[in-house]
Amino acid sequence: MRKRLQLIIFFISISVGSFAQVGQGGNWGGGVDDQIFSPGFTFQYLSSEYKIYKKVDWQRPYPNPDVPGQFLTDSLKSISSPLSPGFGLGFITGFKLGNNTDLRITPTLVFLDRLINYEYADPEKFYQQKVATTTVEFPVGFKLKSDRRLNFRAYLLAGGKYSMDIISKKKTDDSGFALTEKFVKNQKNILSYEVAIGFDFYFEYFKLSPEFKLSNSINSVLKPEDHPYSSPLDKLYTRNFQFSLYFE
């Protein structure tokens, strides 16, 4: 909550500063609105979770393959995915399609750990699985902008994203691990849709755009395997809440 409050205060400060500059009478922004092509960079804060689809028999204990009639785990009570933080760094490639429409491509490197909580009938056997990811992302979006009011615009954005997980195979190699120590793994290639709302603030030599975005994967990211943490799962979809600062 404290971090969210700090973000809101920061956003308000930027807004106040921008409108103060409007009073100075400058049509600022470094001429970015007059360019067909506008480069830049972005910093992103993400909060991510899995949308979990479970198998019909997800609650049953996982059997011990070496000892018939015995089980490696207790009966499951719930499987959930809490929000977990991450961050990203990227570049902006913007193309002006019209006075109120842009095409924006933002190649980004994202570092993110997602979590899955397993609660068993015995509360002491609670287990949390961490799924570490490092992804190269290629979002493509159409930006629909309001008319510029001196040094301010609002906009909506919609588009799609291709993500490729580049985390080292060595970090996810659990071939020599016991079944109760195995990892839940993601597919390497992920497709997502995105929607966002943002604001363009024009300073003397650049444009700053804070943006709030929701992103959901289209395909299941689960790589199915036979062990106690993957077997109860049918599908996993990613859901990201993202706050970004774009500089152009």
What are these regions (language model features)?
Residues Q21-P85, E248:
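Short glycine/proline- and aromatic-enriched beta-strand/turn motifs that initiate or cap beta-hairpins
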Residues G26-W28, K185-V195, F199-E248:
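Predominantly the C-terminal beta-signal and adjacent terminal strand-loop region
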Residues Q35-P39, L83-F87, A132-F138, F152, ...:
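Residues that define the transmembrane beta-barrel architecture of outer-membrane proteins
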Residues V56-A121:
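Glycine- and aromatic-enriched membrane insertion/assembly motifs of diderm outer-membrane
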